[in-house]
């Protein structure tokens, strides 16, 4: 099944988007992300414009009810058959009533549509990683790995 690279979901109704349609939302989200994390990553953090270009080039991007922007990619794990959808970023961009559990359901659905064996969400951009792990666990996600940075 073909799944467009850029997609908008409003109340479950999918609408394919062009790069030109999704780009302003992605650029604004990357500016917010950059401002939050520039102190932590310093010179290693891509500029907002660079990050937007990478995402627009490399990721599937879904805008859910104008509330959440999720970028994901297909990833293979060296130790497992098949592939998973891996969340590259999950950003709240609106103030509507979309629940985080709905975002997880969307990703599970996309995993099925892509033929993936599941999906993965990370905590790399969270300011409080322990809190985000607890939040994800409350929504039924299970921790499967720990990644340490040196």
Regions found by a protein language model. Give the residues of each.
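Short amphipathic alpha-helix that is part of the acyltransferase structural core
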Residues: 1-45
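A short helix-loop-beta-strand connector motif used in the catalytic cores of GNAT acetyltransferases and
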Residues: 50-64
